[in-house]
């Protein structure tokens, strides 16, 4: 009798786990969105990983995953998603714009700056690109000191651009 219960339990677990693995994409997406809305960041990131395995070319999923990772202050995870999006050939503009909009919508606009500074540090070949986005962010925040610092940095590599003066 005891052996039947153990076998039954293992059979139930194997069926349950296989059913979870075969969840429709929309169901997993809804669960990820629910976790994000409830600020359950680790669970949301786990769901976004599943979604990205199924559809790796969807920018919105990368945006959500980066913001959830930033809310956990996990810089390695943030960079993992940024690099994965680059490997998929997705536009950095779409990624950065999405992060900006989403972080503002949840009242955490500092996440956008955090991500830009991290990308600038980890991928120095994107310094000019990230500085342009940082300049726009600092103008939005009316942060004169940082505006001048970024503008000076941009002018040092592009002295002919008078719009940075």
Regions found by a protein language model. Name each.
Residues 26-50, 54, 129-146:
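Alpha-helical segment of the N-proximal tetratricopeptide repeat
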Residues 37-38, 71, 104-108, 140:
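Register position in tetratricopeptide repeats
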Residues 56, 90, 124-125, 159-160:
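Short coil turns that delineate tetratricopeptide repeat
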Residues 64, 97-98, 133:
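Canonical tetratricopeptide repeat
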Residues 76-87, 109-122, 145-155:
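Alpha-helical repeat scaffolds
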């Amino acid at each position: 009798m005891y052996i039947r219960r153990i076998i039954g339990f293992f059979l139930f677990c194997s069926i349950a786990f296989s059913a979870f693995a075969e969840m429709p994409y929309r169901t997993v997406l809804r669960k990820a969105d629910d976790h994000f809305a409830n600020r359950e960041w680790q669970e949301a990131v786990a769901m976004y990983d599943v979604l990205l395995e199924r559809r790796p070319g969807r920018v919105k999923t990368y945006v959500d995953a980066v913001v959830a990772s930033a809310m956990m202050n996990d810089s390695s995870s943030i960079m993992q998603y940024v690099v994965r999006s680059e490997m998929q050939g997705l536009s950095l503009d779409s990624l950065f714009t999405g992060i900006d909009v989403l972080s503002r919508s949840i009242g955490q606009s500092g996440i956008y700056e955090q991500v830009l500074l991290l990308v600038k540090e980890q991928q120095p070949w994107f310094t000019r690109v990230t500085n342009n986005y940082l300049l726009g962010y600092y103008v939005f925040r009316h942060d004169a000191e940082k505006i001048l610092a970024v503008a000076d940095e941009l002018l040092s590599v592009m002295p002919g651009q008078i719009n940075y003066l």
